[in-house]
């Protein structure tokens, strides 16, 4: 059942409500949840009134937001970080969904340090990007230089490219890495960032009818080799991998788990590391003992949220470096499926359209789901 709500009981730090354009209307909209469970059952659309910013606040409009696996996990209640419940609806605490998005300044407070028209990104995670407008403290966002940037590039920079950039930062020119999920958002970003930095890569993908098309697409992005999961797990094919790399793969990036993770771990050279940043298969990690003893392999996890919230200034530098790659035409944005929400339509229609995008995100398929509001 679709749920639409209206409220005037708002936390000033959480909501602001200008029109979507540069003029002011009466309401903004947000996708919120007050309990966890099946995403389509817990998401509600909230309509909220306009408030003017105080001197240290800023009024924002959304230029787009994404739906990432972490967002879905937060709705399901299986993610360690959760957005704050900063608004009351029907006497229940509710949180705004979304961690990644791009905003534009509509009305800057006198001491905000921002100006009308500026593009900004959330400084930390759990910002609540799934809303048309936001009234926030100015120090919770970071201004970006939007010169030669598209909205898609800026909207999608904070999660996948930043994750890839940080996981590869300790490798040196000429080093090898191997990754599963080579067609994923992080995988594509890692291929490109690695290529820019002079790294060599092997990307593992699932077999499919258009495999050769995908292989060409990824090698055009900069992948040194693209192989299938079956090849990665084949002990005979491991000899081919060793002939390419000299047995000196330093890093394995794992976003799948299960047998796929085991396969790429086996390809590591002495002193190599496998870093797990996701678990799409929902299968546990099972590694043989030998490589850990005789090849001094290490295994660890990487969680962008922890790093980004602990080091927001470093995160800002990482994002600016990725923007530099975009401006130099060295980096390509991930494939996206853009869903548009028409602000002139009723709440039931808007919620239905959002749930359709959410369903596509849950199914996966290689394209990031990006949502934009239609201006009017």
UniProtKB/Swiss-Prot annotation:
Any Pfam family the entry gives: ADH_zinc_N
Give the binding site residues for NADP(+).
Answer: 160, 183-186, 206-208, 277-280, 302-304, 368
Task: Indicate the residues that form the catalytic site.
Answer: 79 (proton donor)
Q: What is its EC number?
A: 1.3.1.104
What superkingdom heads the lineage?
A: Eukaryota
Q: Which UniProt keywords apply?
A: Fatty acid biosynthesis, Fatty acid metabolism, Lipid biosynthesis, Lipid metabolism, Mitochondrion, NADP, Oxidoreductase, Transit peptide
For the keyword Oxidoreductase, the answer is yes
Here the transit peptide covers 1-12
Q: GO biological process annotations for this chain's record?
A: fatty acid biosynthetic process; fatty acid metabolic process
Spell out the GO cellular component terms annotated for this protein, sorted alphabetically and separated by semicolons.
mitochondrial matrix; mitochondrion
The free-text function statement in the UniProt record for this protein reads:
Catalyzes the NADPH-dependent reduction of trans-2-enoyl thioesters in mitochondrial fatty acid synthesis (fatty acid synthesis type II). Fatty acid chain elongation in mitochondria uses acyl carrier protein (ACP) as an acyl group carrier, but the enzyme accepts both ACP and CoA thioesters as substrates in vitro. Required for respiration and the maintenance of the mitochondrial compartment.
Q: How does it assemble?
A: Homodimer.
Q: Which PANTHER family match?
A: ENOYL-[ACYL-CARRIER-PROTEIN] REDUCTASE, MITOCHONDRIAL (PTHR43981:SF2)
User: What's the protein here called?
Assistant: Enoyl-[acyl-carrier-protein] reductase, mitochondrial
Query: Origin organism of this chain?
Result: Yarrowia lipolytica (strain CLIB 122 / E 150) (Yeast)
Q: Top-down, what is the taxonomic lineage of the species of origin?
A: Eukaryota, Fungi, Dikarya, Ascomycota, Saccharomycotina
Gene expressing this chain: ETR1
